[in-house]
Amino acid sequence: MENIHIQTKSKEYDVHVGREALSHLTTLIQKMNPAVSNIMIISDEAVASLHLQTAVDALQVEQKVFSFVVPSGEKEKSFENFYEAHTSALENKLDRNSLIIALGGGMIGDLAGFVAASFMRGIRFVQVPTTLLAHDSAVGGKVAINHPLGKNMIGAFHQPEAVVYHTPFLHSLPEKEWRSGYAEVIKHALIGDVELYHWLKEEVQTLTDLRDEKLIHILTKAIPVKANIVSQDETEKGIRAHLNFGHTLGHALEKELGYGNITHGDGVAVGMLFAMFLSEQVYKVDLSYEEMKQWFLKYGYPKMPSDLNVERLVQLMKQDKKANAGTIHMVLMQEYGGVNVVSISDETVHIALEAFQKDMV
């Protein structure tokens, strides 16, 4: 098992990665101080049907263990489910010494983490990711639910006690979820580990290569990129915004197409391509955009939909959390491994989006 140490101003914890990582969960809980009183597992229907019993069986503890299961899908990261989770916690007599376990992908990690952050003004939680995408969201303490007007608009910063990445859980993922998570791996490589980027181009020819030792290698290289940034900027006052590379357009596409109609990773992949397309114009540099586009298409990432209204996308991009005083701020790339947050006028974004949309046809 590989261990990755995460250090922030508010907390230090470890990410445990491996084929036997789940066996470490009981020991982690037994070492917690103050002692854990009882345990609430939050999951979704798809994950629960596959892995909930495995997780419960792995918890060889004396404490009461109960579960709260929501329907699957990004749209379930809602205030209604957040409220119902609190109701379940109260009915089952959770207290300030209780523990919440987030068993699932990024949606569950965000929802369960925000429940933990707000229940009795904050209790402990552990992330047990079941998707590749969650290698990003499970680390760093950003937890949130969606609002009809925007993604992740209601939330908090609340670090987990630990992240337990039991890689066999990923074996049940459909291809679209492998692709979605791999987009965030590519993002981490592009912004913070150029050596990993070149390794991916050589070693991951198809999504089926994301297995076994290669999967563990990818996780142990991509997670430290985020860990390094979070250690310097826990609450996104500066360089943590670099982790939003590709997300300004990506989130706009998710909102416009409807949560669940495009995966987060597919949206981010299109967003990264657009960011590189625009970066070449802004910085007058050659980032091999055309080569990158073909590389993305090889994995099955979508093209920019040709029928989307560009002005509508511009307005949605202005609702992004990085926007300031109604001005779009995007993470752009000067070179591989070197990104910055840049303010961009509506007109510039509109013109670039139209050109990008035509280029992707």
Curated annotation (Swiss-Prot):
NAD(+) binds at residues 72-77, 130-131, 142, 151. GO terms for molecular function: 3-dehydroquinate synthase activity; metal ion binding; nucleotide binding. Its EC number is 4.2.3.4. GO terms for biological process: amino acid biosynthetic process; aromatic amino acid family biosynthetic process; chorismate biosynthetic process. Binds 1 divalent metal cation per subunit. Can use either Co(2+) or Zn(2+). It holds the Pfam family DHQS_C. Signal peptide: none annotated. Zn(2+) binds at residues 184, 247, 264. Keywords: Amino-acid biosynthesis, Aromatic amino acid biosynthesis, Cobalt, Cytoplasm, Lyase, Metal-binding, NAD, Nucleotide-binding, Zinc. Its main location: cytoplasm. The keyword NAD applies. Belongs to the sugar phosphate cyclases superfamily. Dehydroquinate synthase family. This is 3-dehydroquinate synthase.
